[in-house]
Amino acid sequence: MRVDELRVDERIKSTLKERGIESFYPPQAEALKSGILEGKNALISIPTASGKTLIAEIAMVHRILTQGGKAVYIVPLKALAEEKFQEFQDWEKIGLRVAMATGDYDSKDEWLGKYDIIIATAEKFDSLLRHGSSWIKDVKILVADEIHLIGSRDRGATLEVILAHMLGKAQIIGLSATIGNPEELAEWLNAELIVSDWRPVKLRRGVFYQGFVTWEDGSIDRFSSWEELVYDAIRKKKGALIFVNMRRKAERVALELSKKVKSLLTKPEIRALNELADSLEENPTNEKLAKAIRGGVAFHHAGLGRDERVLVEENFRKGIIKAVVATPTLSAGINTPAFRVIIRDIWRYSDFGMERIPIIEVHQMLGRAGRPKYDEVGEGIIVSTSDDPREVMNHYIFGKPEKLFSQLSNESNLRSQVLALIATFGYSTVEEILKFISNTFYAYQRKDTYSLEEKIRNILYFLLENEFIEISLEDKIRPLSLGIRTAKLYIDPYTAKMFKDKMEEVVKDPNPIGIFHLISLTPDITPFNYSKREFERLEEEYYEFKDRLYFDDPYISGYDPYLERKFFRAFKTALVLLAWINEVPEGEIVEKYSVEPGDIYRIVETAEWLVYSLKEIAKVLGAYEIVDYLETLRVRVKYGIREELIPLMQLPLVGRRRARALYNSGFRSIEDISQARPEELLKIEGIGVKTVEAIFKFLGKNVKISEKPRKSTLDYFLKS
């Protein structure tokens, strides 16, 4: 099917042609003929890189241009939202406005009403539904990317509830990797089902075992080791993507591979890699990353900072980095294809010990093999060490992906959603709640809601007992102020209960370590883990701070290993946050507490939200005397600063280090800086021309500074 055959606005056709698209892949053509341009719901289950997103783009833009209204594109990750935001910019050329919404769950974000296409994470859109944002009534089409994540234990319920709310109110398009029960999901959504295994680049799959790769067609190739699979790809001027099961392993394997890979590179390639390595900020994780990059290999995992993850992804796509060793986070929708994908580990650690990686995840990883426009064939290879290679082949290569199951019955998910139905959607009886539940994927799969009804009644009792709701003699449910605020804050009611229970102690002795320990014990945060080696030091620090904590010694009721671990994981997290707000350099925090930069940012983002939520719950409970203290602490958490730097944080391009440099140089307020001359600020370490120009523009003064080298620097001395 050619673009010219498409019965859509000419502006859509011209935009596609500007991208170099003249015709559609077979599954794209099938989807576009299925009725989605006429408003039918659709579930599109096709392989990675087969053009799922483009189908959704055309449907969204066509709907907006023909019927008005808005389109919402739901993604699972902030990084994916950023990627799609960049991709969708093309549509601004024809007059559509594109926006991205992630984070800040306590806002209606009415500004989004000015936009036509809104990209949001599932959690963000769920929070907007709870806040009753006025523009949501104008949403005519909703796309759920990675819809198979409805089966995710952590986040599936959120996506399911969004879809249940929007069914019948907007056209729904689900984009999915291959799943085991697409018919079931499509029937629930009342959607046309498009399933295909067609790929733009042929995928050749095999299993490596004891020096041989056995391909799915029965042919065999010899390789001396699994590492040789990487070196062979690089000799062919191709890239390799290796998946392992742990972060530390990703780092170790990347460093080991880089030693050999470097010998396969040209001098210009090594020069480009050295420049890349030199651009990284200094911290212990980045030191390892820089060392690996100098040898042409990088590692990628959630512990890396955002800038480092983007740097690795972009330079791997460009071919500067030759191989990437990653944990499966990289397979979650981010666009990083490679000629050869190697799955080094098919087992991973879980809460229940070692378990096999699901088939659906392995298929997603293997699906990254083959770069459209560059490769005629992509190769996906599973490394089998102790497992029977024939069984691995049958299970993963020829096996059918697992069925998806609703996660709505998970108690934490259900608790939050039941309160939201009462507090923000006006449901006032058990029957009304059950009627909503009857429209969910859970009810569709189970065919009855009896087992869920008992859980819902238990949740209602919990909400009643803890003053989130009240129930009249006529069994009418009414939300109380605590329930309404909790639902809109987008926190677990159990978190709000913990805040309520400890509020008196917080008011009596407000202190950072106590508050950080409290929020780190809530179900809304995943605290840092610790090793046996760290435990002794954590115990020592605990005795230093125990009088400032709001929770008793975990051993007070006898030894319980689960409670001990929970308590000290929260305590370690509190120590990291305390170091962060006391301006301890990131590298020192990484080294002292054995954490990664990406994890620090994740914890900081969540902690800021929970301190804000604690402040809001304090208002509801009338504890106004600590509101200002908590707001100050929230700002300190956000920026990682001591209190005296807060006034300087409103300056553009000024983070924690530049603010400290300004303060230590005598510029302690906005007024001090407004009276300074540009050359005075330029003398301060870390303050460059762009920063000074931005600061003065913020102050309403236009200053242009010619970029001259600073004569005091060693760099200038060496060049002169």
Swiss-Prot record:
Induction: Constitutively expressed (at protein level). Coiled coil: none annotated. Its EC number is 5.6.2.4. GO terms for molecular function: 3'-5' DNA helicase activity; ATP binding; ATP hydrolysis activity; DNA binding. Divalent cations, Mg(2+) and Zn(2+) are best. Residues 229-422 form the Helicase C-terminal domain. SUPFAM superfamilies: P-loop containing nucleoside triphosphate hydrolases (SSF52540), Sec63 N-terminal domain-like (SSF158702), Winged helix' DNA-binding domain (SSF46785). ATP binds at residues 23, 28, 46-53. Belongs to the helicase family. Hel308 subfamily. Monomer. Interacts with PCNA. This is ATP-dependent DNA helicase Hel308. The gene is hel308.
